[in-house]
Amino acid sequence: VDARSAALVRANFRSVIEAPNGSERLVSAFYGHLFAENPQLRELFPPAMDMQAKRIVTAIQYVLDHLEDWGRAQKFLEQLARDHRKYGVDAAHYDAAGRALLSAFRAYNGAAWHRGLEEGWRDITILISASMAIGANSDKSQPFWEATVVGHRRVLEDLAIVRLQSESPIPYQAGQYVPLTVPQRPKMWRYFSPAIPANPYGEIEFHIRKIRGGWVSPAIVNETRVGDRWQIAGPLGGLHVDRESGRDVLMIGAGTGIAPLRAQLIEMGQRGINPRVHFFIGGRYPCDLYDVENMWQLSQSNPWLTIVPVCEQKTNPWWYPHPPQEEPYGMHRRLIGNLGAVVASFGAWADRQIQIAGSAKMIADTRRALIAVGTPEHIISSDPV
């Protein structure tokens, strides 16, 4: 894709996502064309397609952001195709998906469509469909594993820690996330990061918070029972500590976003030599730092790890039923303020490799705060959310 075409499709896509209901209209047109041409594909997907719409827009944006670094975009698309194997989608379906996506952009733009957009989006959709077909063909492993719930602990009213055991180990790396579906909401795949590294016993743990208005997370927190069988698909994402870089590490996690960072730290604790790590754990209230004591205990036996708790509010909300928890002796005092602003107040951290995990807003705000004080953008890593 040449520079002119890249600029043209980026501007066009920006006009789509900035328009009222633009993303929803585009994705609705995409699925309309896809299922009209391939009605057998409809039964592979859940009845509610709202999350699919968000993922499609996020994926297109990622590709457009990395056209000049196509190797990175291709790796992302191949991984995305491997993920779609859980639906029963295979390599043969991606040509149809590419045609449907081009038709969706053509229909959305209407009279504003012209030859330059046709050629630019045609090239982009061909690249996307070809890369995803390669990804689908490259993975011969099983599309998902079954795991049994062996523990469900309600840490807060809206947060649960769920432990499961699969019959065989699930091959993920600490820091990755996995799609899963639960019996209470079949076919509704959602993405969560394991909070512990993979082990040979098939044990896996998730920290899950209810999303207001969500379908799956409230069912997991409120309705999960020991003995439930979950399906867990292959891993995605690339958060990791680069041990060859020679750089120390800054980790910034909020709420259940600590899970992928926590898993990496536990795995690092099993090694003899590690880079220094500063781990800022954030939450709105002190009670949101539900795992800070466990992380503090980990730091006690691993002197390379420093834990720094951060809260927006000094005290718990009035409805929280438990007395204030005493901070472990010797832990860094709790800092008060916005997590990103607090971290940025210490400087640019330009000599670190930086990972951010949390909500989309938290990641964006923290990234912006760091860049504003001089942090090089290329040293900051986060997963698309």
Show where each model-derived region lies:
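Core of compact, soluble alpha-helical bundle domains
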Residues: 1-145
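Ferredoxin-reductase
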Residues: 141-229, 247, 283-284, 310-314
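Short, conserved phosphate/pyrophosphate- and ester-handling motifs at nucleotide-, phospho-/glycolipid
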Residues: 175, 257, 359
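Histidine-anchored nucleotide/phosphate-binding helix
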Residues: 260-270
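A short, basic/flexible loop-to-alpha-helix module at the beginning of a structural domain
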Residues: 234-246
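Conserved beta-strand elements of the Class I
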Residues: 249-250, 355
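Reductase modules of NAD(P)H-dependent flavoproteins
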Residues: 16, 276-385
